[in-house]
Amino acid sequence: MTVAHILIVEDSPDNMKLFRTLLTLKGHSVTGIPGGEELFSTLAGGRPELVLMDIQMPGKDGFELLAEIRASEYADLRVIALTAHAMSGDREKAIAAGFDGYITKPIDIRLFPEQVLSALAGEAPQGG
């Protein structure tokens, strides 16, 4: 099993707790922040192998934050969209914007750890 440092950018405390629990139970090191204000200072403190980012957040949304990441020294980070947007075309929009994968919320707690492993392996996870 691949054990990794994962950064979660998620404004919902309940979702953050769930994601953190599922990933730490699999042995991953997890850092969680509630939004973009802390993103670059957190990245400077330790580069994660993977970023899981909510798309709809107060302040800057996930698309804006991703654009900032892609224009920075962290441009090569793997960033996976975490979103409740599950309508036709939403996944394509996220991938076109530069996300490396797309996981819908609410997540399937049985599949989520495997989706993260796929992302760590360089694959593009999809679905919920």
Residue map of PLM features:
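Receiver (REC) domain active-site loop signature in two-component systems and cognate sites
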Residues: 57
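Active-site beta3 strand of CheY-like receiver
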Residues: 46-52
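Active-site residues of response regulator receiver
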Residues: 54, 83
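Two-component/phosphorelay signaling modules centered on CheY-like receiver
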Residues: 13-31
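C-terminal output helix
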Residues: 107-116
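Conserved acidic carboxylate
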Residues: 10
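Conserved Asp/Asn-Gly motif in the active-site loop of CheY-like receiver
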Residues: 33-37
